[in-house]
Amino acid sequence: MIQGGDPNGDGTGGAEDTIKGEFSSNGVKNDISHVRGTISMARSTDPDSASSQFFIVQSDSTHLDGDYAAFGHVTSGMDIVDQICKDAKPTDGNGTIAKDQQPVIESIRMVD
């Protein structure tokens, strides 16, 4: 998987305001499964701690269903996600990429 949305670029950042975790183990029905291409909210161990960080599932990870708030799907460009994951050179066990090598989302489009 690939994770983004951290303003600090080190996996620790986020907005001051957080949102309720919208997944079944937190009392909210969410039928979106964590299959390849799913976009979901990242969070800490607190189920209501999501803010700006998100992740894109590169390969089916249905073990996350019910515990993370999936909210969308990549409609095109999974080849780019695959290439980023392939080229990544993590600096630690958490998959952190050096700041000068982190990919940047330059544009995004939401589709209904």
Regions found by a protein language model. Give the residues of each.
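Cyclophilin-like peptidyl-prolyl cis-trans isomerases
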Residues: 1-112
